[in-house]
């Protein structure tokens, strides 16, 4: 078991910037905490593994799969591996990215 207390406090929102910090590398998952100032964005990109996006504070616009949705605190979005997506901060905030290494998880499943 690994505990990351008060994860939101690990990265401050910086003026006119996007900041990222890996806060956990664990078995089957990696957590990256991002902070964004208003108007900052991650242009369209992909991830090699499935990911979960969770807004910790602030408001984000997520575009993927020909859809655009707002991501607010308490919301979670799942994106499949290699799905092109982008992130835009509509207000200052922090976003937690969970990268799920399904290959590693599959290796952990018992075989019968």
Predicted regions and their residues:
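Structural motif
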Residues: 30, 59-61, 68, 84, ...
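Short, conserved beta-strand element in jelly-roll/cupin
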Residues: 35-37, 47-62
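Short acidic-glycine-tyrosine-enriched beta hairpin
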Residues: 66-81
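A cytosolic small-molecule/anion-sensing beta-strand core signal
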Residues: 56-57, 72-73, 91
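Ligand-binding loop in jelly-roll beta-barrel domains
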Residues: 81-105
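Conserved short histidine dyad/triad with adjacent acidic residue
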Residues: 17, 30-47
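Short beta-strand His + acidic residue motifs that chelate non-heme Fe in jelly-roll/DSBH
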Residues: 42-44, 62-63, 79, 84-90
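A short, N-terminal "cap"/entry segment at the start of jelly-roll beta-barrel domains
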Residues: 1-28, 63, 111-112
């Amino acid at each position: 078991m690994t505990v990351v207390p008060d994860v939101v406090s690990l990265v401050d929102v910086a003026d006119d910037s996007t900041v990222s910090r890996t806060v956990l590398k664990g078995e089957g998952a990696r957590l990256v905490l991002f902070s964004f100032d208003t108007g900052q964005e991650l242009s369209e990109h992909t991830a090699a593994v499935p990911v979960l996006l969770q807004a910790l504070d602030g408001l984000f616009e997520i575009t993927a799969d020909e859809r655009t949705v707002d991501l607010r605190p308490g919301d979670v979005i799942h994106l499949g591996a290699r799905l092109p997506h982008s992130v835009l901060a509509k207000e200052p905030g922090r976003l937690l990215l969970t990268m799920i290494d399904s290959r590693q998880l599959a290796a952990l499943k018992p075989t019968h």
